[in-house]
């Protein structure tokens, strides 16, 4: 049975507040409420964002007498690793996280020769109901808090440092959920990720990607924030007739509206927009659709667009599969012939259901 679109999360209790939920002013207020001197706020932020420590009992520059109090009030254990699985010779690791209310989400850490990327979740489940995506088939449980999002990043950065002596370079909001449907918390998380220590992790905004199925008003709103992050538009079809089915939000905002919003984003930020296109055998891989995709993107975005073709990854309950390689190559050639940059994405994590469209946070 097809899922219905859900833009509002079901009513649920909120996760406990955490240091990562607060901006600088909020941290100062939280520290003052504990009766601590103002400089402790910056100290705590430095420990968390700079040293990647999430347990005040390990913060040796804090008086021992206040560590337990700070742990209880500002550092609740929001996410517990319930399961980890790896593939690609240990270069890809998927973690199933369990939140304080029992909901589960997933993140995927991918190590490459020149970069280290973590794919993070912004919601538990997803309300966008895309039929080829495991997350969309499961529906929306709730939004994640800012701190629950940020904690996925801190955990990945700490793992890279402690296990490999390496640094986290890239963050992509491509895990569970539609990031722009959880706008305020995702925006706050992006700020924590990109601001320099001691107020954030200091990851370049150009190395942070926020994906969306095409919530046009929110794309424009994000452009006006002028954060400079990369926008990834999950398009998957160049014509409204097919996209209405593949990406049901298209019934609310048509392709032309999504592309106009993407053009606005590129114009305001100067950043090239990434267009994601899952190639599905005999569904959206026809030559004429490749031609139309190239024409529409070139007309809307000119040189400020790049197409990432994604070979469809298998998901439970779906009979669709990836297009054959010759069809894939022809599709790339035709899109490029329209003057649009196009490549096939390197797929990681398929064996452990960690690839694009496979995350569902099941089990544990």
UniProtKB/Swiss-Prot annotation:
InterPro entries: Aldolase_TIM (IPR013785), Methyltransferase_A (IPR040072), RNA_MTrfase_RlmN (IPR027492), rRNA_lsu_MTrfase_RlmN/Cfr (IPR004383), rSAM (IPR007197). It is an enzyme of class 2 (transferase). Its EC number is 2.1.1.192. Keywords: 4Fe-4S, Cytoplasm, Disulfide bond, Iron, Iron-sulfur, Metal-binding, Methyltransferase, rRNA processing, S-adenosyl-L-methionine, Transferase, tRNA processing. S-adenosyl-L-methionine binds at residues 177-178, 211, 234-236, 313. Disulfide bonds join 119-356. It is found in: Cytoplasm. The keyword RNA-binding does not apply. Binds 1 [4Fe-4S] cluster. The cluster is coordinated with 3 cysteines and an exchangeable S-adenosyl-L-methionine. Residues 112-350 form the Radical SAM core domain. PROSITE patterns: RADICAL_SAM. GO terms for cellular component: cytoplasm. One of its GO terms (molecular function) is rRNA binding. One of its GO terms (biological process) is rRNA base methylation. It catalyses: adenosine(2503) in 23S rRNA + 2 reduced [2Fe-2S]-[ferredoxin] + 2 S-adenosyl-L-methionine = 2-methyladenosine(2503) in 23S rRNA + 5'-deoxyadenosine + L-methionine + 2 oxidized [2Fe-2S]-[ferredoxin] + S-adenosyl-L-homocysteine; adenosine(37) in tRNA + 2 reduced [2Fe-2S]-[ferredoxin] + 2 S-adenosyl-L-methionine = 2-methyladenosine(37) in tRNA + 5'-deoxyadenosine + L-methionine + 2 oxidized [2Fe-2S]-[ferredoxin] + S-adenosyl-L-homocysteine. Coiled coil: none annotated. NCBIfam families: rRNA_mod_RlmN. Specifically methylates position 2 of adenine 2503 in 23S rRNA and position 2 of adenine 37 in tRNAs. HAMAP family: RNA_methyltr_RlmN. Reaction proceeds by a ping-pong mechanism involving intermediate methylation of a conserved cysteine residue. This is Probable dual-specificity RNA methyltransferase RlmN. It comes from Mycobacterium ulcerans (strain Agy99).
């Amino acid at each position: 049975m097809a899922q219905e679109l859900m833009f509002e999360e079901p009513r649920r209790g909120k996760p406990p507040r955490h240091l990562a939920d607060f901006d600088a002013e909020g941290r100062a207020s939280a520290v003052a409420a504990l009766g601590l001197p103002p400089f402790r706020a910056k100290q705590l932020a430095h420990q968390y964002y700079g040293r990647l420590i999430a347990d005040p009992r390990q913060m040796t520059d804090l008086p021992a007498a206040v560590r337990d109090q700070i742990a209880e009030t500002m550092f609740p254990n929001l996410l517990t690793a319930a399961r980890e699985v790896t593939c690609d010779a240990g270069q890809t690791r998927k973690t199933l996280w369990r939140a304080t209310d029992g909901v589960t989400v997933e993140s995927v850490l991918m190590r490459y020769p020149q970069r280290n990327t973590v794919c993070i979740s912004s919601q538990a489940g997803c309300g966008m109901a895309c039929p080829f995506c495991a997350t969309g088939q499961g529906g929306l449980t709730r939004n994640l808090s800012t701190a629950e999002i940020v904690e996925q990043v801190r955990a990945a950065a700490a793992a890279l440092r402690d296990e490999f002596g390496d640094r986290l370079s890239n963050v992509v909001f491509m895990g569970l959920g539609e990031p722009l449907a959880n706008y305020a918390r995702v925006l706050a998380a992006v700020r924590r990720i990109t601001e320099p220590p001691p107020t954030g992790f200091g990851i370049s905004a150009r190395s942070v990607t926020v994906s969306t199925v095409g919530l046009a008003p929110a794309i424009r709103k994000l452009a006006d924030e002028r954060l400079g992050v990369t926008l990834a538009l999950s398009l998957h079809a160049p014509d409204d007739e097919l996209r209405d089915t593949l990406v049901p939000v298209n019934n609310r905002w048509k392709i032309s509206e999504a592309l106009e919003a993407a053009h606005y984003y590129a114009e305001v930020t100067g950043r090239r927009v990434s267009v994601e296109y899952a190639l599905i055998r005999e569904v959206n891989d026809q030559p004429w659709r490749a031609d139309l995709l190239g024409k529409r993107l070139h007309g809307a975005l000119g040189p400020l667009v790049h197409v990432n073709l994604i070979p469809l990854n298998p998901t439970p309950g779906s009979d669709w599969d990836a297009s054959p390689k010759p069809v894939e190559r022809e599709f790339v050639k035709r899109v490029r012939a329209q003057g649009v940059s196009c490549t096939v994405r390197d797929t990681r994590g398929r064996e452990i259901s960690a690839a694009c469209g496979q995350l569902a946070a099941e089990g544990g």
